[in-house]
A protein has these predicted regions:
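Substrate-recognition element of Asp-dependent hydrolases with the DxDx(T/V) motif
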Residues: 34-71, 80-92, 131
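Residue-level marker of alpha-helix boundaries and capping positions
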Residues: 28, 61, 118-119
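Anionic group-transfer/hydrolysis microenvironments
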Residues: 6, 55, 100
Length: 177
């Protein structure tokens, strides 16, 4: 399964209508319920893959080193199997930046994941669009900045705990892994 990072696993700082990732490792705050939700998903044998846009690197307001420190911390702390990060900005026209499905496709190829039997959990419309384009069942963690009008998720939830409940229920209903 695929997860966005900021706003799903860790707290964002919202200024105006825009969420911002932590600036330093010291600012990383794992959201309540995340470890237990991931443990429940892992117990069902789901690979936990993070796919995250980190455009502040291209914008020069963040270093790749700090982003990778945060990613490594989350991998260790939350037992994430892999993190795929896009460091491009909106205008770079890369294949990896969500809403394009490039990171999901690459991860699926590298980890032998059947996208049609996968889930994408994110807090913004681009996460949902990327998941849908890749053929995943999509779950939106509905936040004030999510821009829901720009996407049609399969499910809307309040947080990752609720997303895990939806996924576990769907697995039980459909005999997926």
């Amino acid at each position: 399964m695929f997860l966005d990072r900021d706003g799903v696993l860790n707290r964002t700082t919202v200024r105006g209508d825009t969420p911002y990732p932590p600036n330093t490792l010291a600012e990383v705050e794992i959201l309540p319920g995340v470890p237990d939700a991931l443990d429940a998903l892992r117990a069902r044998g789901l690979p936990l893959i993070v796919v995250t846009n980190q455009p502040d690197v291209a914008r020069g307001t963040q270093t790749r080193e700090v982003v990778e420190q945060i990613n490594q911390f989350l991998m260790r702390r939350l037992h994430i199997d892999a993190v795929y990060a896009c460091y491009h900005d909106n205008g770079d026209d890369c294949a990896c930046r969500k809403p394009k499905p490039g990171m999901l496709m690459r991860a699926a190829d590298e980890h032998g994941i059947d996208l049609s039997r996968s889930f994408m959990v994110g807090d913004r419309w681009g996460d949902v669009a990327a998941g849908a384009a890749a053929g995943c069942e999509t779950i939106l963690v509905n936040m004030p900045y999510s821009q829901c009008h720009r996407c049609s998720p399969d499910h809307k939830v309040a947080d990752l705990r609720e997303a895990a409940d939806v996924i576990l229920r769907r697995l039980d209903e459909s005999s997926l892994p």
